[in-house]
Amino acid sequence: MGDYPALPVQLDSDRVIPFYSYLAKEFVFADHHFGSGSNSTPGHMLAIGGQMPTLKNPPFIGPHPVWDLPSIFTTADAGHVSWAAFPDQGGYPTKLYTSLTTTPGSANVFPPKDFIPMAKAGTLPEICYVWSPSGYDEHPPHVSDPTYITKGHDLVWERVQAVIDGGGWADTTFILTWDDWGGYADSVPTPVIETVPDALHPDGWVAIGGTRIPLIMFGGQVMQHIDSEWHSHASIPKTIMDLLGLPPMGVPRVDTAPTMAHHVDASLKRAAPPVPGSTIRQPTPPTPRPTPVAPAPWAGPLGQSLPPLVTRDGSVVPAPTDGLVRPKPPKPPVIR
Protein backbone atom coordinates (compact mmCIF):
# COMPACT_ATOMS: atom_id res chain seq x y z
CA MET A 1 0.00 0.00 0.00
CA GLY A 2 1.15 3.53 -0.57
CA ASP A 3 0.51 6.79 -2.38
CA TYR A 4 1.77 6.43 -5.94
CA PRO A 5 1.06 8.28 -9.16
CA ALA A 6 -0.94 6.46 -11.81
CA LEU A 7 1.11 4.63 -14.43
CA PRO A 8 -0.19 5.24 -17.99
CA VAL A 9 -0.31 1.82 -19.66
CA GLN A 10 -2.54 0.47 -22.41
CA LEU A 11 -3.45 -3.16 -23.10
CA ASP A 12 -4.73 -4.54 -26.39
CA SER A 13 -7.62 -6.42 -24.81
CA ASP A 14 -8.94 -7.91 -28.06
CA ARG A 15 -5.58 -9.53 -28.77
CA VAL A 16 -4.33 -10.49 -25.29
CA ILE A 17 -7.60 -11.39 -23.55
CA PRO A 18 -10.14 -11.88 -26.36
CA PHE A 19 -12.59 -13.98 -24.32
CA TYR A 20 -12.76 -11.44 -21.50
CA SER A 21 -13.09 -8.63 -24.03
CA TYR A 22 -15.96 -10.42 -25.78
CA LEU A 23 -17.81 -11.04 -22.52
CA ALA A 24 -17.40 -7.43 -21.39
CA LYS A 25 -18.90 -6.16 -24.65
CA GLU A 26 -21.72 -8.69 -24.96
CA PHE A 27 -22.91 -8.82 -21.35
CA VAL A 28 -22.46 -6.65 -18.23
CA PHE A 29 -19.21 -4.82 -17.64
CA ALA A 30 -18.95 -3.01 -14.30
CA ASP A 31 -16.51 -0.15 -14.72
CA HIS A 32 -16.90 1.28 -11.20
CA HIS A 33 -16.52 -1.90 -9.19
CA PHE A 34 -13.88 -1.87 -6.46
CA GLY A 35 -12.27 -4.08 -3.84
CA SER A 36 -10.19 -3.29 -0.80
CA GLY A 37 -7.33 -0.85 -0.61
CA SER A 38 -5.02 -3.72 0.20
CA ASN A 39 -4.03 -6.97 -1.51
CA SER A 40 -5.13 -10.53 -2.27
CA THR A 41 -6.43 -12.00 0.99
CA PRO A 42 -8.60 -9.01 1.99
CA GLY A 43 -10.00 -9.00 -1.55
CA HIS A 44 -10.90 -12.68 -1.49
CA MET A 45 -12.50 -12.46 1.95
CA LEU A 46 -14.48 -9.37 0.98
CA ALA A 47 -15.94 -11.36 -1.94
CA ILE A 48 -16.74 -14.39 0.23
CA GLY A 49 -18.23 -12.74 3.26
CA GLY A 50 -17.84 -8.98 3.03
CA GLN A 51 -15.28 -8.75 5.85
CA MET A 52 -11.51 -8.43 6.12
CA PRO A 53 -9.90 -9.67 9.35
CA THR A 54 -6.46 -8.82 7.95
CA LEU A 55 -5.03 -6.28 5.52
CA LYS A 56 -2.15 -8.46 4.37
CA ASN A 57 -1.55 -11.98 3.11
CA PRO A 58 -1.13 -14.63 5.82
CA PRO A 59 1.43 -17.37 5.07
CA PHE A 60 0.38 -19.35 2.02
CA ILE A 61 2.35 -22.38 3.26
CA GLY A 62 2.42 -23.67 6.81
CA PRO A 63 0.48 -22.38 9.85
CA HIS A 64 -2.01 -19.63 9.15
CA PRO A 65 -4.88 -17.91 10.99
CA VAL A 66 -8.44 -19.18 10.75
CA TRP A 67 -11.48 -17.03 11.49
CA ASP A 68 -15.04 -18.05 12.37
CA LEU A 69 -16.84 -15.57 10.15
CA PRO A 70 -20.16 -15.71 8.29
CA SER A 71 -19.91 -16.11 4.54
CA ILE A 72 -22.01 -16.71 1.46
CA PHE A 73 -21.64 -20.42 2.26
CA THR A 74 -23.03 -20.24 5.80
CA THR A 75 -25.80 -18.04 4.43
CA ALA A 76 -26.56 -20.65 1.76
CA ASP A 77 -26.75 -23.31 4.47
CA ALA A 78 -29.24 -21.16 6.37
CA GLY A 79 -31.35 -20.89 3.21
CA HIS A 80 -31.04 -24.61 2.37
CA VAL A 81 -29.27 -23.85 -0.90
CA SER A 82 -26.50 -26.16 -2.14
CA TRP A 83 -22.99 -24.82 -2.68
CA ALA A 84 -19.39 -25.74 -3.46
CA ALA A 85 -16.02 -24.01 -3.27
CA PHE A 86 -13.04 -24.74 -5.51
CA PRO A 87 -9.98 -23.03 -3.97
CA ASP A 88 -6.41 -23.36 -5.24
CA GLN A 89 -4.20 -26.40 -4.72
CA GLY A 90 -3.33 -25.31 -1.17
CA GLY A 91 -6.91 -24.61 -0.14
CA TYR A 92 -6.51 -20.84 -0.38
CA PRO A 93 -8.52 -18.80 0.45
CA THR A 94 -11.21 -21.08 1.94
CA LYS A 95 -8.73 -22.47 4.47
CA LEU A 96 -9.00 -19.16 6.34
CA TYR A 97 -12.62 -19.91 7.39
CA THR A 98 -13.52 -22.21 10.29
CA SER A 99 -16.78 -23.26 8.64
CA LEU A 100 -14.94 -24.34 5.48
CA THR A 101 -12.20 -26.33 7.21
CA THR A 102 -14.43 -28.32 9.58
CA THR A 103 -17.39 -30.60 9.00
CA PRO A 104 -19.91 -30.38 7.52
CA GLY A 105 -18.73 -27.44 5.40
CA SER A 106 -15.39 -28.98 4.43
CA ALA A 107 -17.24 -31.69 2.48
CA ASN A 108 -18.27 -29.02 -0.04
CA VAL A 109 -14.71 -27.81 -0.68
CA PHE A 110 -13.10 -29.42 -3.74
CA PRO A 111 -9.68 -29.27 -5.43
CA PRO A 112 -9.48 -27.18 -8.62
CA LYS A 113 -9.21 -30.24 -10.86
CA ASP A 114 -12.74 -31.33 -9.91
CA PHE A 115 -14.58 -28.34 -11.36
CA ILE A 116 -14.52 -29.18 -15.07
CA PRO A 117 -15.61 -32.84 -14.65
CA MET A 118 -18.43 -31.81 -12.30
CA ALA A 119 -19.53 -29.01 -14.64
CA LYS A 120 -19.54 -31.28 -17.69
CA ALA A 121 -21.53 -33.89 -15.76
CA GLY A 122 -24.10 -31.28 -14.75
CA THR A 123 -23.56 -32.02 -11.04
CA LEU A 124 -22.59 -28.57 -9.81
CA PRO A 125 -24.61 -27.18 -6.89
CA GLU A 126 -26.55 -23.91 -7.01
CA ILE A 127 -23.68 -21.70 -5.80
CA CYS A 128 -20.06 -22.19 -6.86
CA TYR A 129 -17.05 -20.08 -5.98
CA VAL A 130 -14.18 -21.04 -8.27
CA TRP A 131 -10.62 -19.77 -7.97
CA SER A 132 -7.76 -20.13 -10.43
CA PRO A 133 -5.01 -22.45 -9.20
CA SER A 134 -1.44 -21.29 -8.76
CA GLY A 135 0.17 -20.70 -12.13
CA TYR A 136 -3.16 -19.73 -13.68
CA ASP A 137 -4.12 -16.79 -11.47
CA GLU A 138 -2.71 -14.10 -13.80
CA HIS A 139 -0.26 -12.79 -11.21
CA PRO A 140 2.92 -11.61 -12.94
CA PRO A 141 5.62 -14.26 -12.40
CA HIS A 142 8.99 -13.57 -10.79
CA VAL A 143 10.64 -14.87 -13.97
CA SER A 144 9.51 -13.50 -17.33
CA ASP A 145 6.70 -15.58 -18.85
CA PRO A 146 4.72 -13.90 -21.64
CA THR A 147 2.01 -16.58 -21.36
CA TYR A 148 1.03 -15.88 -17.75
CA ILE A 149 -2.12 -13.98 -18.70
CA THR A 150 -3.05 -16.37 -21.49
CA LYS A 151 -2.91 -19.41 -19.19
CA GLY A 152 -5.37 -17.92 -16.72
CA HIS A 153 -7.59 -16.48 -19.42
CA ASP A 154 -7.79 -19.81 -21.24
CA LEU A 155 -8.57 -21.77 -18.06
CA VAL A 156 -11.53 -19.49 -17.35
CA TRP A 157 -12.67 -20.00 -20.94
CA GLU A 158 -12.45 -23.80 -20.56
CA ARG A 159 -14.34 -23.73 -17.28
CA VAL A 160 -17.15 -21.67 -18.77
CA GLN A 161 -17.33 -24.10 -21.68
CA ALA A 162 -17.57 -27.01 -19.23
CA VAL A 163 -20.70 -25.43 -17.74
CA ILE A 164 -22.10 -24.99 -21.24
CA ASP A 165 -21.29 -28.62 -22.11
CA GLY A 166 -23.11 -29.74 -18.96
CA GLY A 167 -26.28 -27.91 -20.02
CA GLY A 168 -25.91 -25.09 -17.51
CA TRP A 169 -25.59 -22.01 -19.72
CA ALA A 170 -29.28 -21.06 -19.90
CA ASP A 171 -29.78 -20.62 -16.16
CA THR A 172 -26.27 -19.88 -14.85
CA THR A 173 -25.18 -16.38 -13.87
CA PHE A 174 -21.41 -16.00 -13.96
CA ILE A 175 -19.57 -13.24 -12.08
CA LEU A 176 -15.93 -12.87 -13.13
CA THR A 177 -13.60 -10.61 -11.18
CA TRP A 178 -10.20 -10.48 -9.50
CA ASP A 179 -9.08 -10.32 -5.87
CA ASP A 180 -7.31 -6.99 -6.20
CA TRP A 181 -6.20 -4.40 -8.68
CA GLY A 182 -2.72 -5.90 -8.94
CA GLY A 183 -1.17 -2.84 -10.48
CA TYR A 184 -0.33 0.72 -9.56
CA ALA A 185 -2.55 3.66 -8.73
CA ASP A 186 -5.87 3.97 -10.51
CA SER A 187 -6.65 7.10 -12.50
CA VAL A 188 -10.21 7.20 -11.11
CA PRO A 189 -10.61 7.78 -7.35
CA THR A 190 -13.12 5.60 -5.55
CA PRO A 191 -15.42 6.73 -2.71
CA VAL A 192 -13.70 7.06 0.66
CA ILE A 193 -16.08 4.74 2.51
CA GLU A 194 -14.05 3.11 5.29
CA THR A 195 -10.58 4.06 6.45
CA VAL A 196 -7.71 2.76 8.60
CA PRO A 197 -5.03 5.05 10.08
CA ASP A 198 -1.34 4.23 9.67
CA ALA A 199 2.05 5.89 9.93
CA LEU A 200 1.66 7.73 6.64
CA HIS A 201 -2.06 8.46 6.97
CA PRO A 202 -2.97 9.45 10.54
CA ASP A 203 -6.45 10.39 9.35
CA GLY A 204 -6.82 7.06 7.58
CA TRP A 205 -6.20 5.55 4.16
CA VAL A 206 -9.01 4.10 2.04
CA ALA A 207 -9.51 0.47 3.08
CA ILE A 208 -12.96 0.18 1.48
CA GLY A 209 -13.14 2.09 -1.74
CA GLY A 210 -9.74 0.79 -2.62
CA THR A 211 -9.06 0.67 -6.32
CA ARG A 212 -11.34 -0.23 -9.20
CA ILE A 213 -11.33 -3.87 -10.29
CA PRO A 214 -12.92 -5.17 -13.50
CA LEU A 215 -16.09 -7.21 -13.02
CA ILE A 216 -17.94 -9.01 -15.80
CA MET A 217 -21.36 -10.58 -15.30
CA PHE A 218 -22.62 -12.93 -18.00
CA GLY A 219 -24.87 -15.90 -18.69
CA GLY A 220 -27.92 -17.02 -20.62
CA GLN A 221 -30.20 -14.59 -18.76
CA VAL A 222 -27.79 -11.65 -18.36
CA MET A 223 -28.43 -8.46 -20.32
CA GLN A 224 -25.97 -6.31 -22.25
CA HIS A 225 -25.09 -3.25 -20.19
CA ILE A 226 -22.32 -1.05 -18.83
CA ASP A 227 -22.83 -0.89 -15.07
CA SER A 228 -21.49 2.46 -13.85
CA GLU A 229 -22.77 2.14 -10.29
CA TRP A 230 -20.26 2.10 -7.46
CA HIS A 231 -20.13 -1.30 -5.76
CA SER A 232 -17.53 -3.42 -4.01
CA HIS A 233 -16.76 -7.12 -3.71
CA ALA A 234 -19.41 -7.19 -0.96
CA SER A 235 -21.97 -6.84 -3.75
CA ILE A 236 -21.03 -10.29 -5.04
CA PRO A 237 -22.55 -12.24 -2.12
CA LYS A 238 -25.36 -9.68 -1.95
CA THR A 239 -26.25 -10.36 -5.59
CA ILE A 240 -26.21 -14.12 -5.03
CA MET A 241 -28.45 -13.74 -1.99
CA ASP A 242 -30.93 -11.64 -3.96
CA LEU A 243 -30.99 -13.98 -6.97
CA LEU A 244 -31.60 -17.05 -4.81
CA GLY A 245 -33.81 -15.48 -2.13
CA LEU A 246 -31.36 -16.15 0.70
CA PRO A 247 -31.72 -14.59 4.17
CA PRO A 248 -29.49 -11.70 5.28
CA MET A 249 -25.91 -12.63 6.13
CA GLY A 250 -25.83 -10.50 9.25
CA VAL A 251 -22.85 -8.52 7.93
CA PRO A 252 -23.96 -4.91 7.34
CA ARG A 253 -21.44 -4.35 4.56
CA VAL A 254 -23.06 -7.20 2.60
CA ASP A 255 -26.70 -6.81 3.60
CA THR A 256 -26.74 -3.12 2.60
CA ALA A 257 -24.52 -3.47 -0.48
CA PRO A 258 -25.78 -2.44 -3.93
CA THR A 259 -27.08 -5.47 -5.78
CA MET A 260 -26.40 -6.50 -9.36
CA ALA A 261 -29.36 -8.90 -9.50
CA HIS A 262 -31.31 -6.54 -11.76
CA HIS A 263 -28.94 -7.38 -14.62
CA VAL A 264 -30.54 -10.84 -14.78
CA ASP A 265 -33.76 -11.19 -16.79
CA ALA A 266 -35.40 -14.62 -16.84
CA SER A 267 -37.03 -13.85 -20.19
CA LEU A 268 -33.66 -13.58 -21.95
CA LYS A 269 -32.08 -16.40 -23.94
CA ARG A 270 -28.62 -15.08 -24.70
CA ALA A 271 -26.34 -17.05 -27.00
CA ALA A 272 -23.39 -18.88 -25.47
CA PRO A 273 -19.90 -17.50 -26.16
CA PRO A 274 -17.50 -19.03 -28.71
CA VAL A 275 -15.82 -22.32 -27.82
CA PRO A 276 -12.26 -22.33 -26.44
CA GLY A 277 -9.54 -22.07 -29.04
CA SER A 278 -11.76 -20.53 -31.67
CA THR A 279 -11.11 -17.15 -33.23
CA ILE A 280 -13.39 -14.67 -31.53
CA ARG A 281 -15.11 -12.09 -33.67
CA GLN A 282 -15.63 -9.12 -31.38
CA PRO A 283 -19.05 -7.43 -31.40
CA THR A 284 -19.47 -4.51 -33.78
CA PRO A 285 -18.93 -1.21 -31.94
CA PRO A 286 -22.21 0.67 -31.42
CA THR A 287 -23.03 3.71 -33.50
CA PRO A 288 -23.09 6.39 -32.27
CA ARG A 289 -20.42 5.74 -29.69
CA PRO A 290 -21.98 5.71 -26.19
CA THR A 291 -21.22 8.61 -23.90
CA PRO A 292 -19.61 7.51 -20.61
CA VAL A 293 -22.01 7.73 -17.68
CA ALA A 294 -20.69 9.08 -14.41
CA PRO A 295 -21.72 7.03 -11.38
CA ALA A 296 -24.15 8.44 -8.87
CA PRO A 297 -22.56 9.40 -5.55
CA TRP A 298 -22.11 6.58 -3.06
CA ALA A 299 -25.44 6.31 -1.25
CA GLY A 300 -24.05 5.16 2.10
CA PRO A 301 -21.97 6.94 4.73
CA LEU A 302 -18.45 8.09 3.88
CA GLY A 303 -15.26 8.46 5.88
CA GLN A 304 -16.16 5.82 8.46
CA SER A 305 -13.56 3.93 10.49
CA LEU A 306 -13.24 0.27 9.58
CA PRO A 307 -15.54 -1.48 12.10
CA PRO A 308 -14.94 -4.63 14.19
CA LEU A 309 -15.90 -7.86 12.48
CA VAL A 310 -19.12 -9.84 12.88
CA THR A 311 -18.30 -13.40 13.97
CA ARG A 312 -20.32 -16.62 14.09
CA ASP A 313 -19.23 -17.60 17.59
CA GLY A 314 -19.67 -14.19 19.22
CA SER A 315 -15.94 -13.64 19.73
CA VAL A 316 -14.46 -10.18 19.29
CA VAL A 317 -12.37 -9.59 16.17
CA PRO A 318 -11.24 -5.97 16.00
CA ALA A 319 -10.83 -4.06 12.77
CA PRO A 320 -7.47 -4.92 11.20
CA THR A 321 -4.56 -2.49 11.42
CA ASP A 322 -1.82 -4.72 10.01
CA GLY A 323 -1.46 -3.17 6.58
CA LEU A 324 2.10 -2.73 5.34
CA VAL A 325 2.79 0.86 4.35
CA ARG A 326 5.35 1.57 1.63
CA PRO A 327 6.41 5.22 1.33
CA LYS A 328 8.07 4.63 -2.06
CA PRO A 329 6.43 3.09 -5.11
CA PRO A 330 7.71 -0.20 -6.49
CA LYS A 331 9.82 -0.24 -9.62
CA PRO A 332 7.56 0.16 -12.67
CA PRO A 333 7.40 -2.75 -15.10
CA VAL A 334 9.24 -2.72 -18.39
CA ILE A 335 6.71 -1.82 -21.08
CA ARG A 336 7.28 -3.64 -24.36
Residue ranges with predicted function:
Residues 1-336:
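N-terminal pro-sequences and low-complexity stem/linker regions of secreted or lumenal proteins
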